[in-house]
């Protein structure tokens, strides 16, 4: 575990910055659209493109891990992230916003965000510690919003939204050394199959995943998760501004979500090592939908918004260690990044619907009422189905193997 600690710290820092910046982009929705004379739906197109690019490229990045290793993908993703923020800060219209916030940051997230970070953490630690460590890494991933949200709001208020985005680019540059250090996980050899047979191919792993009812249901429910979270991350600042709340309340709410996400991620990482991960997922989706309904059913207040943010934060990214751990239990480590990427692609299609659909419904109806009601209804359905069909832990795909990470002498020179 001592040898893995620098890797875990580095991947936690990288994930924290990547997710913190991404979850705080909604702070710039109102000033950016006013300055560039864009509709809300135009900005949400960029966020929707980001989520689709992220989702479509996630399984590709996961598959390339077995060919190139983690380091080139992590470092390349960090560089793409910084480039995307610079393009966004210099944007003069919709095209620049879509290329910067959409295409470049979407590509970057496929290589720097949760799915890749949790695959690195899974590779770095033994199976007995995996669920708790995944919770810790997920928790670290939420800390970036505690810094990014207030920083972005302060810079936007004092010097304009372009200064806020450029501040994000400077903060994002810290991902580059973190990504390089996290790439040391390439030195850790994969578990050795005890039967001496060759490992399964990518095609066999994918076929097994799509035949597994538990995996298919989990991926479908993940769609709803993405729809709910990105709707909130993108549209909550706009909703509060429309209701006449102080602009800083949006940043405070995002920071509270991030802070309580630390507690929630640690809890669900711990709980996933003791109870059915899929049952916990269903309970999480159901609870999140109830909290969403309770908040949007009444006019917002500062105190109510912060309480909502705390509750939602506890339930925010606890899905990460549960889904990642479920994939390892079902299919093992070798193709974890790719198969988890398939599930995450479903999440990102939901994110596309949440970001774009929320903006379209607002432009058509002048309110978010129908959008949040759809989010609550689909979330309750996903949670109940996930609990109804929760399966016991299956054995990993293929014969048993040693799960303890070990340094591969052939890779020690990296």
Residue ranges and their predicted role:
Residues 257-261, 267, 275-326:
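C-terminal transmembrane helical hairpin of 12-TM major facilitator-type secondary transporters
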Residues 101-139:
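Cytoplasmic helix-loop-helix junction between adjacent transmembrane helices
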Residues 57-70, 265-277, 363:
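Helix-to-loop junctions at the C-terminal end of transmembrane segments
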Residues 137-187:
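Helix-loop-helix hairpin linking two adjacent transmembrane segments in secondary transporters
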Residues 32, 111-125, 318-331:
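Intracellular juxtamembrane helix-capping segments at the cytosolic ends
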Residues 25-29, 212-265:
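Extracytoplasmic gate region of multi-pass secondary transporters
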Residues 56-95:
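Conserved MFS/SLC helix-loop-helix module at the cytosolic interface between two early adjacent transmembrane helices
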Residues 96-112, 304-318:
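Hydrophobic core of transmembrane alpha-helices in multi-pass small-molecule transporters
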């Amino acid at each position: 575990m001592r040898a893995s600690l620098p890797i875990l710290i580095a991947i936690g820092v990288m994930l924290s910055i990547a997710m913190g910046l991404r979850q705080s982009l909604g702070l710039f929705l109102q000033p950016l659209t006013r300055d560039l004379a864009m509709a809300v739906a135009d900005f949400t197109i960029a966020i929707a493109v980001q989520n689709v690019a992220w989702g479509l490229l996630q399984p590709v990045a996961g598959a390339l891990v077995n060919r190139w290793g983690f380091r080139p993908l992590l470092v390349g993703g960090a560089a793409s992230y910084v480039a995307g923020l610079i393009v966004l800060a210099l944007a003069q219209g919709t095209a620049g916003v879509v290329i910067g916030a959409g295409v470049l940051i979407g590509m970057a997230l496929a290589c720097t965000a949760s799915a890749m970070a949790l695959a690195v953490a899974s590779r770095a630690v033994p199976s007995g510690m995996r669920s708790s460590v995944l919770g810790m890494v997920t928790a670290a991933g939420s800390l970036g919003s505690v810094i990014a949200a207030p920083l972005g709001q302060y810079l936007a208020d004092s010097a304009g939204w372009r200064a806020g985005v450029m501040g994000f680019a400077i903060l994002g540059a810290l991902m580059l050394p973190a990504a390089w250090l996290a790439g040391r996980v390439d030195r850790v050899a994969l578990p050795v199959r005890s039967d001496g047979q060759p490992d399964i191919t990518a095609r066999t792993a994918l076929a097994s995943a799509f035949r597994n009812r538990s995996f298919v249901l989990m991926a479908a429910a993940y769609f709803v998760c993405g729809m709910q979270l990105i709707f909130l991350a993108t549209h909550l600042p706009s909703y509060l501004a429309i209701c006449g709340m102080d602009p800083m309340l949006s940043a405070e709410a995002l920071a509270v979500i991030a802070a309580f996400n630390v507690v929630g991620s640690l809890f669900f990482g711990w709980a996933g090592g003791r109870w059915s991960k899929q049952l916990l997922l269903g309970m999480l989706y159901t609870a999140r939908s109830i909290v969403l309904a309770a908040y949007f059913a009444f006019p917002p207040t500062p105190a109510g918004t912060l309480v909502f943010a705390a509750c939602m934060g506890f339930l925010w990214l606890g899905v990460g260690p549960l889904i990642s751990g479920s994939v390892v239990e079902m299919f093992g480590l070798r193709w974890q990044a790719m198969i988890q990427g398939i599930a995450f692609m479903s999440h990102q299609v939901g994110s596309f619907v949440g970001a774009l659909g929320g903006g379209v419904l607002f432009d058509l109806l002048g309110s978010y009422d129908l959008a949040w009601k759809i989010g609550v209804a689909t979330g309750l359905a996903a949670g109940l189905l996930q609990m109804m069909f929760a399966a016991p832990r299956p054995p990993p795909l293929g014969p048993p193997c040693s799960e303890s990470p070990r340094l591969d002498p052939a890779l020690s020179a990296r």
